[in-house]
Amino acid sequence: MKTNKKRLCVALLTCAAAAMFAMRAQGSAADEIKRLAALMQWKPGTIAADIGAGDGQFTFAAVEHLGAEGKIYATEIDTKKLEELKAEVTKRKLQNVVVVESKEADTNLPTACCDAIFLRRVYHHLTKPVEFDANLVRSLKPGGRLAIIDFPPRAGLDPVEGVPANRGGHGIPQRIVIEELTAAGLKVEKVVNDWPENDYCVLFVKK
């Protein structure tokens, strides 16, 4: 009997910890998106894209800011994550979230479809950055903004397979992000070095 009670207590504590972690993650995403929305000057009717949306927590946080008049594309390359994203969009009955399967070198977004595009901890995973950058630029409207949120290479993290050697490990130096995206035709508008979790954010604009 004592063993069963002990197991029940452990299970309840585990569930409580998981729930607290999920709530904290949602809160963190909401706070970060609030800051990003201000930085990128989102307004009613803004069309955005979350590249490499993963589990969608930043996509769904963004929807709260974009409102019914806005729209967001959530792109993902992983098949399982794509299906989970689609299921969650259906569950939430969201009409302004479009899930898109991206490719290694292609966002698969329509041409000039977005006012704002953001990549959060995704850019350092790109194996074909030159081609992908060209796609990002193509997907932006004139005057559209691109935000790259990422971090410098960090010790203790396994290198990402297939990425260019100039990344220097798991992560990417800020100067490389700037060099590659200015070469693609974008202009740096602002650099933020105090982003949450010791990340940085580089904001570009398409002229």
Protein language model regions, located:
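A short acidic, Gly/Pro-enriched loop at the edge of an enzyme's catalytic core
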Residues: 43-46, 107-117
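A short SAM/SAH-binding and catalytic strip from SAM-dependent methyltransferases
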Residues: 113-130
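A short glycine-rich, Lys/Arg-flanked "PGG" loop and its adjoining helix->strand segment in the class I
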Residues: 63-64, 130-145
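Conserved alpha-helix/loop element of class I SAM-dependent methyltransferases that forms part
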Residues: 28-46
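Conserved class I S-adenosyl-L-methionine
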Residues: 44-54, 82, 145-176
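Core SAM-dependent methyltransferase catalytic element
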Residues: 189-207
